[in-house]
Curated annotation (Swiss-Prot):
One of the GO BP terms on file: tetrahydrobiopterin biosynthetic process
Species classification: Bacteria, Pseudomonadati, Pseudomonadota, Gammaproteobacteria, Pseudomonadales
Signal peptide: none
Organism: Marinobacter nauticus (strain ATCC 700491 / DSM 11845 / VT8)
Domain of life: Bacteria
InterPro entries: PCD_sf, Pterin-4-alpha-carb_dehyd, Pterin_deHydtase
Catalytic activity as recorded in UniProt: (4aS,6R)-4a-hydroxy-L-erythro-5,6,7,8-tetrahydrobiopterin = (6R)-L-erythro-6,7-dihydrobiopterin + H2O
Protein name according to UniProt: Putative pterin-4-alpha-carbinolamine dehydratase
HAMAP family assigned to the protein according to its UniProt record, in alphabetical order: Pterin_4_alpha
E.C. number: 4.2.1.96
Amino acid sequence: MSNLGQQSCSACSADAPQVTDAEKQTLLKDVPEWQLIVQDGEEQLQRVFTFKNFVQAQAFTNKVADLAEEEGHHPAILLEWGKATVRWWTHKIGGLHKNDFIMAARTDELY
């Protein structure tokens, strides 16, 4: 069982390495609901969360925002009626770092 959800983000600099393909495959097993996507040439993790109404989706996005502030690592969030789409990636390195998988796991715990 993964402990990604219990981990915190490490400081990341612009020269930090992106996760390797092998690391991605291992880490994805810990966040199976998340998909790898490419947006604007950068690989990202994305998941769509569904809710019964707008208010529940909004409350969830507020929890994700609080988590992001706590960790100093911020996602893209699209809030719509009955759903919220969350995308994690590390802006400084233009792709995926282990921090993104940690935040995906922690986001899952909020759902």
